[in-house]
Design a protein with these regions (language model features):
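The canonical Cys-X-X-Cys-His
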Residues: 36-47
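Outer-membrane beta-barrel architecture
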Residues: 129-131, 161-163, 222-224, 267-269, ...
């Protein structure tokens, strides 16, 4: 594997700076260092969020208060964390992930031979990322930045935004602007991209023939409202985003563009019980699409699309987490410039079972299935399943080893062909 010199230098520079800064003896990710807690305060196993971690995020990266019993008014947002001293080192965190993997791919050809097979094995530097986040003391403002020092041979800004949060801990509202994830980190646990596997659920991340996916980080604005009962036993939240959306090549529009229409995303969440929740999600937009690229029949049009999703999970006995979800996809589709528009439709389901043997030690299994069609082509079916184990090597939860096996069958509704990928992976994640 070829690793860019720039990426390695960036990683070494950040590590050196962080090591030279004065730190407490227990080096754990920034928020845990700041509050003197373990990673499990906000995570089941990092990066999967629990109810407390969800509320921490909704409060603008402020810790939910323990004393919210209803006997007196809940503290205002500006009153939270008043006893926590701001420290530069507690605003920064670094993540490093490396792995060893074996991969086998079988692709249908529609010809002779009917399929081709390739295999590979490698040691990998999966990711090196730098985070900066936290509230501005004595104000309602907070900030978040996520820079990929190295990922897939390049470095780039993944997220960067500012937030203003007002109200009280039990009834608050926020406004956010900048480059942010569309779906990742949003919703209750079954809807979040954050999970125990190396990659999010296929139901959430699949890319349709128009290049549309929920796995994007566009520039836009975000607003929302959150209500919580005493001790945060129940949480109700609404969020609304307006973003630039996607360019013709499927990349995020980060600056000026001739695409003047905006995409909208709406999410409603309800948390209940020890750590259960349900989420309803709607995403609507449009994008420029280059059809039949590189041929004499190439043309450009602007299809509209929408996604509707429902998700839920419940944690039994603080041990067994059962998750499920459904996403319906609907896109315009043009075979040529003269025929009436056709439609791309897809129905996908996901199910997952996570069993926590003890804090930081979990077994997991999941299944995704779906069907998609572009008339008049026949319906094609895709599926993905995986199983694995995740174990924290420290009591603090910041060094994790994980082993997983995933098998995924992708079906192309345009070519009516598919491919199957089988991946075994052991990865090591260090968070500081």
């Amino acid at each position: 594997m070829k690793i860019s010199t720039t990426g390695i230098k960036s990683v070494l520079l950040v590590v050196a700076v962080l090591l030279l800064l004065p730190t407490p003896s227990r080096g754990i990710p920034a928020f845990a260092r700041k509050y003197g807690v373990r990673c499990y305060t906000c995570h089941t196993v990092p990066p999967a969020l629990n109810k407390n971690g969800y509320m921490f995020k909704r409060l603008g990266y402020r810790m939910p208060p323990d004393e919210m019993d209803g006997s007196k008014p809940a503290p205002r947002i500006t009153e939270l964390d008043q006893k926590i001293k701001w420290d530069l080192i507690n605003s920064f965190a670094i993540l490093l992930q490396a792995s060893v993997s074996g991969d086998k791919n079988i692709a249908e050809t529609g010809a002779t031979p009917p399929s081709t097979e390739t295999s590979s094995s490698s040691f990998n530097l999966d990711e090196a990322a730098l985070f900066v986040a936290g509230p501005v003391p004595e104000t309602g403002f907070s900030y978040f930045g996520h820079y990929e020092l190295y990922q897939d041979g390049s470095n780039f800004l993944e997220q960067g935004f500012g937030v203003w949060t007002g109200g009280r801990a039990n009834s608050n509202y926020f406004a956010k602007g900048g480059e942010m994830h569309l779906q990742e980190g949003e919703g209750t646990r079954a809807a979040m991209f954050y999970n125990l596997f190396p990659d999010p659920s296929y139901t959430l991340t699949n890319v349709d023939p128009n290049g549309v996916t929920l796995d994007q980080h566009p520039v836009g604005v975000d607003g929302g409202y959150t209500w919580a009962s005493n001790y945060f036993k129940k949480i109700f939240a609404l969020s609304f985003k307006v973003t630039n959306g996607l360019a013709a090549d499927g990349s995020e529009i980060l600056n000026s563009s001739t695409k003047n229409s905006k995409d909208i995303w709406v999410d409603g969440d309800y948390w209940f019980g020890p750590d259960g929740g349900v989420t309803a999600m709607y995403y609507h937009g449009s994008k420029d699409q280059v059809q039949n690229a590189g041929t004499d029949s190439q043309f450009t049009y602007t299809p509209s699309f929408y996604r509707v999703g429902g998700f839920g999970n419940y944690l039994f006995f603080d041990k067994l987490d059962i998750l499920g979800g459904y996403v319906y996809s609907h896109d315009d589709w043009a075979w040529d410039q003269t025929s009436p528009l056709s439609k791309y439709t897809a129905n996908r389901y996901r199910g997952e079972v996570d069993y926590y043997i003890k804090p930081g030690f979990a077994l997991m299994a999941r299944l995704d299935r779906g069907a998609a069609q572009i008339a008049p082509n026949p319906t094609v079916h895709d599926r993905a399943w995986g199983a694995g184990m995740e174990y924290s090597m420290t009591k603090l939860g910041n060094i994790i080893v994980r082993g997983t096996y995933n098998q995924e069958h992708d079906a192309d509704p345009v070519a009516v062909l598919g491919s199957t990928d089988k991946l075994f992976k052991v990865d090591f994640r260090f968070m500081w």
